[in-house]
Regions:
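PLP-dependent aminotransferase class I/II
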Residues: 46-123, 127-130
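PLP-dependent enzyme catalytic core of the Aspartate aminotransferase-like
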Residues: 4, 151-155, 160, 164-193
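Active-site pre-lysine segment of PLP-dependent enzymes
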Residues: 1-19, 23-54
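Short acidic/glycine-enriched loop/turn segments that link adjacent beta-strands
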Residues: 61, 133, 166-169
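Short beta-strand-to-loop capping motifs
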Residues: 69, 139-143, 175-177
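Hydrophobic residues in well-ordered beta-strands that form the structural core
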Residues: 21, 49, 86, 159-161
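Conserved PLP-binding catalytic core of the aspartate aminotransferase-like
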Residues: 112, 120-155, 171
């Protein structure tokens, strides 16, 4: 959603209702009208913005992230959070990762290029792709999503059926390296032919 759409929604929500905005894929987004987290945070006292180190920084196994909000909301959250809610290794890795601008830049460039490549290849194969701003593509075609998931797993390719998101015909694939994406496409062609 655009910044304007999000603000429109926020203006309809009572200030007593906590709104959580998950920006897990924020760094991947290249849409100019995407939400401006700093502007939103300073404007809405009931907004909690969450970020993770699992995506662009690649620290998924460390299970670490953070929240941004106005001071009063942070004070309330600090009263109810568990002590020692992240380990020191995860904290140290996160501190280093957030400063590694070169890694983030390279990851964004690789993802953008490979996402466009995958989107084009899937479209050329007759798939219907949902435009993506993240590190994944959701698509459907002339196949049963559950069967495709099972058959690709047998080939060593992990995709995700997204019926739980009320999209039973769609499969979601994570954007990988050039070699990973080419392997996925090769196996996809084998499975659907």
């Amino acid at each position: 959603n655009s910044h304007e759409e999000f603000e429109s929604m926020m203006n309809k929500i009572p200030s007593s209702v906590l709104v959580i905005l998950d920006l897990a894929y924020f760094e991947y987004v290249d849409a100019e009208d995407y939400v401006n987290a700093n502007e939103l945070m300073s404007k809405y006292s009931n907004l909690l913005i969450t970020k993770t180190f699992s995506k662009i920084q690649g620290l998924a196994s460390l299970r670490i992230g953070y929240g941004l909000a106005q001071p009063d909301l942070i004070a309330v959250l600090n009263k109810i959070r568990q002590p020692f809610n992240s380990n020191s290794l995860a904290q140290e890795a996160a501190c280093e990762a957030i400063l590694d601008e070169e890694h983030i830049k390279k990851s964004v460039e690789l993802n953008s290029y490979q996402r466009d490549f995958l989107h084009q290849q899937l479209t050329d194969m007759g798939m219907e792709c949902i435009p993506s701003q993240g590190n994944f593509i959701s698509f459907k075609g002339n196949f049963d999503a559950k069967d495709l998931f099972t058959n690709l797993m047998k080939q060593g390719v992990i995709v995700r059926p997204i019926a739980l998101y009320d999209m039973p015909e769609y499969i979601r694939v994570t954007v990988g390296t050039k070699d990973e994406n080419e392997y996925f496409l090769e196996k996809l062609k084998e499975v659907i032919s």
